[in-house]
Amino acid sequence: MILVTGANGNLGSATLAALHARGATATGGSRTPGVGVRRLDFDDRVGMDLAGVSTLVLVSAGFAEDDQVIGRHAAVLETASRDGVRHVVYTSLTGAGDHLGFALAHRATERLVRTCGLPWTILRNGLYAELFGGLLMWAGDGVESAFGDGALAAVARADLAEAAAIVSADPARHDGSVYELTGAPITAADVAAGLAVRHRAIGLEEYRRRLLHEVPGLLPFQPPMLSSIATGVRHGFLDGTGTDLAGLLGRPVSDPLAAAVAAASAMRPGRVRTTAGSVPQATA
């Protein structure tokens, strides 16, 4: 049986759905389980149970400080080794993102995966197209961002979920592989054009100020994380493409621009509350 962690999150639920669509025997794990999902709380080392799981899809629990994330991942990997899991598939971060504020937890987890004693596969996911679109801020009759003219090799989340399903359904074929799963470059101006509005660039200082002073509810690690994405895109560090994703899918990657436009459109004034803080998670 395949178990997908974070089954109530966006990537986890999409991966589980993709596995079921392929006819795979799969279930989800979550600290808040529902129908067809078993309880799996990374903070409950004693209560964690992976008995009967042959392949574990470890969706990064990256929405926390590094020490918490790494500790949680270490706990589930220890449980996997104890309970007889035979393969671990980890959803990591693209290698181009090593400078990002949340990269260290991914690289530390990759080290844990490689040394846990189990066969493994690492999926280095590019940033979601949905994230890129969701980070644009509506202002008047247009959108603003700190991305400047930079491009992001964005990926539709559904493509990453399908890739995870393909790998976990036949893990032996992908044993010891590290895949760089990036998409096609898009810019904030491209998204604005798809929305039929204008894009206005703001500086990184102004963006950080808004995150720190105008956005309620952000956790302490979020402003530097989001600022690191903005400067990475703005200065051309996240626009590199590759062929791994299309190779796994056996088809061209989905259009990331369409996904980004849809995400930005969902933030349009009058549909939801729109502030710089209405931001999606980078890894879920």
Segments (PLM) and residue ranges:
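Conserved residues in the N-terminal Rossmann fold of short-chain dehydrogenase/reductase
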Residues: G36-R39, A201
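Oxidoreductase cofactor-interface core, primarily capturing Rossmann-like NAD(P)-dependent enzymes
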Residues: M1-T27, T32, V53-S54, A61-G71, ...
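Terminal hydrophobic/aromatic helix or amphipathic segment near a protein terminus
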Residues: A192-G236, V272-A284
